[in-house]
Curated annotation (Swiss-Prot):
Chief site of localization: cytoplasm
Positions contributing to Zn(2+) 1 binding: 81, 142, 199
GO molecular function: metallopeptidase activity; tripeptide aminopeptidase activity; zinc ion binding
Organism encoding this protein: Streptococcus pneumoniae (strain 70585)
Active site: 83, 176
BP GO terms, sorted: peptide catabolic process; proteolysis
Name used for this protein in its record: Peptidase T
GO terms for cellular component: cytosol
Record function comment: Cleaves the N-terminal amino acid of tripeptides.
InterPro entries: ArgE/DapE_CS, Bact_exopeptidase_dim_dom, Peptidase_M20, Peptidase_M20_dimer, Peptidase_M20B
Protein EC: 3.4.11.4
Chain residues that bind Zn(2+) 2: 142, 177, 381
A Pfam family: Peptidase_M20
Gene name linked to the record: pepT
Amino acid sequence: MTYPNLLDRFLTYVKVNTRSDEHSTTTPSTQSQVDFATNVLIPEMKRVGLQNVYYLPNGFAIGTLPANDPSLTRKIGFISHMDTADFNAEGVNPQVIENYDGGVIELGNSGFKLDPADFKSLEKYPGQTLITTDGTSLLGADDKSGIAEIMTAIEYLTAHPEIKHCEIRVGFGPDEEIGVGANKFDAEDFDVDFAYTVDGGPLGELQYETFSAAGAELHFQGRNVHPGTAKGQMVNALQLAIDFHNQLPENDRPELTEGYQGFYHLMDVTGSVEEARASYIIRDFEKDAFEARKASMQSIADKMNEELGSDRVTLNLTDQYYNMKEVIEKDMTPITIAKAVMEDLGITPIIEPIRGGTDGSKISFMGIPTPNIFAGGENMHGRFEYVSLQTMERAVDTIIGIVAYKG
């Protein structure tokens, strides 16, 4: 189905810079997200028909569409995030390419282009309307496409009371891209049986498995002496960092793994001979494998300290989120419903693990099973990001189908 306000709504959203800041100590991490929620989303939530609309100190804008059929007793939530990834989000100037011809798309005057030879996903979209960047910023389809789709679904349901639906709760939140947005999510206040994050990629994505994730911060303490007299005295902290890294499995890196394979990812190294620091992220799907990866890093640190004769390697491990499959597989109702709705709409569900996490990873462990459904974005987090308007329309169809489902 086509929705006349969907495109303009999306274009309005992406032109607002809501980039999050991982170094911030506030919630949300940037004032722009507060302004976007209170000045743009809250008024529009009220206009499209949501009731009891409010903004919480945790950065979430919340609203409710009451059920219009007493036989539909479920309460279902839909969640999308306001922030965008760590890439330029100022001056977003989207291009709308109608009836895409399957060829190269020049991204404004930037010199960058979307070429099917480089981005095979473009082969799915001839004849469709694509929204791209102008090459100077990201687009923000992750996840403003999700926000626009949820808002449009509510607008349509309000205008068509003949479509019977259950109670719907909507939540638009901050800071998903920096991994802390759901930390303060109020599951008791949201009060639904289950929810969906509308934060996926291409048409048909339906996901209920994520990585389990941890961060590892390492400090290496060296001893700096003049290199001319260093023998037997100098301890080079940078060399310790190299030695530690070289003891990790050489093929367990993001660029060499796929599917259900986990990894260690070295994110940053800084330092000097005297001291050095390294930051890693650890990812795996199975709980035992995840715990084994953390234990392996600790074992390497302990072994190095033993060989060095002092505690020169300090490791701090912090769990970040867990595979929501552990929660959702106990009651697959949200997956069963979404899958049935997609199939009724002629959409082939793509059920595969997310090699990442969503807000749903944390919210699921707060007591609300929250799988993820497609929002349409491709090549997210950079200048080559784009989204199909037709896929966004199908996401709206799916949301409407889920809340009207009577099975």
